[in-house]
A protein has these predicted regions:
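A short beta-loop-alpha structural element at the N-terminal edge
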Residues: 1-10, 14, 18
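Conserved acetyl-CoA binding element of GNAT-fold acetyltransferases
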Residues: 66-79
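Conserved active-site alpha-helix within GNAT-family acetyltransferase domains
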Residues: 87, 110-129, 133-136
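A short helix-loop-beta-strand connector motif used in the catalytic cores of GNAT acetyltransferases and
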Residues: 34-51, 70
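Conserved beta-hairpin
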Residues: 47-61, 66
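Conserved acetyl-CoA pyrophosphate-binding loop and the N-cap/start of the following alpha-helix
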Residues: 53, 80, 84-92
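Conserved GNAT-fold acetyl-CoA-binding loop/helix
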Residues: 13-39
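Conserved GNAT acetyl-CoA-binding A-motif
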Residues: 97-111
Length: 189
C-alpha cells in the first residue's frame, strides 16, 4: 500500500512539480524522502500514516501525516484537481490528528511556496513571515492549522415547500403509525 502511494506521489511530482524546483539538490532530497522501504518502515513503526483517495479503485490522491502531526505527501493527480480531493484528504488527516493522535494543531511545509495560497484557502496560516529555503534555492512556507473533530459543512437552505412537505409527511407517518398500533393492540380509536 505504501509502495503504491509512493509510486503515485513520485509520478505526480515528476508530472507537475519537478520543473518548479531549480536545483538538483531539491530533486535528490525528494527522491530520498520518497524511499518506499523507509516510508513502509515508518508506517509499521507508527511514525507515519498515509490516506488515499480513490475513484472506482483508481488512486487519485494521497496524503500522509507523521505521529507529530506534520502533513506530508499531499498529491492529487492533475486529472482530479479542483474536485475537492485535496481538501477532503486534508480534512481526513486533521480529524486523524485530533481523534487518534490527540494533537490540537497540525503543520505542513507548503512547497513549492506558491502552494501556500491553496493551504490558506483550506484553513492554514503561515507559521512565520515569508518563506524559508530548504538548504537550496527553493522556497517553502511553514504553515499550521487546528486539528478538527469532524468535517464542518456549510448548511444549505431548504426551500419552504420542501420543509412543509417533509413536515406533513412525517406528521402523517406518526398519525398512521399510532392508528395501526391502536388497531393491533385492540384499542378503538
Amino acid at each position: 500500500e505504501i509502495k503504491g502511494a509512493c509510486a503515485f506521489a513520485v509520478s505526480i511530482y515528476n508530472i507537475a512539480i519537478r520543473g518548479c524546483f531549480r536545483t538538483q539538490e531539491s530533486h535528490r532530497y525528494f527522491d530520498e524522502y520518497m524511499d518506499a522501504d523507509r516510508l513502509t518502515d515508518e508506517e509499521r513503526a507508527g511514525v507515519l500514516v498515509v490516506f488515499g483517495a480513490f475513484d472506482s479503485n483508481v488512486l487519485c490522491g494521497v496524503c500522509g501525516m507523521t505521529n507529530e502531526g506534520h502533513i506530508t505527501m499531499l498529491y492529487v493527480h492533475p486529472q482530479y484537481l479542483r474536485r475537492g480531493i485535496g481538501k477532503k484528504l486534508l480534512e481526513r488527516v486533521r480529524i486523524y490528528a485530533r481523534m487518534q493522535l490527540k494533537i490540537m494543531q497540525v503543520s505542513v511545509n507548503a512547497m513549492p511556496a506558491y502552494t501556500a495560497d491553496y493551504f490558506r484557502r483550506v484553513g492554514f496560516k503561515s507559521a512565520y513571515q515569508g518563506g524559508f529555503c530548504n538548504g537550496q534555492d527553493d522556497m517553502y512556507v511553514p504553515m499550521t492549522a487546528k486539528s478538527i473533530y469532524q468535517v464542518e459543512y456549510t448548511p444549505r437552505h431548504i426551500a419552504d415547500k420542501t420543509f412543509i412537505a417533509i413536515s406533513v409527511g412525517f406528521t402523517c407517518l406518526v398519525f398512521f403509525s399510532g392508528l395501526i398500533y391502536a388497531v393491533c393492540a385492540g384499542l378503538t380509536p
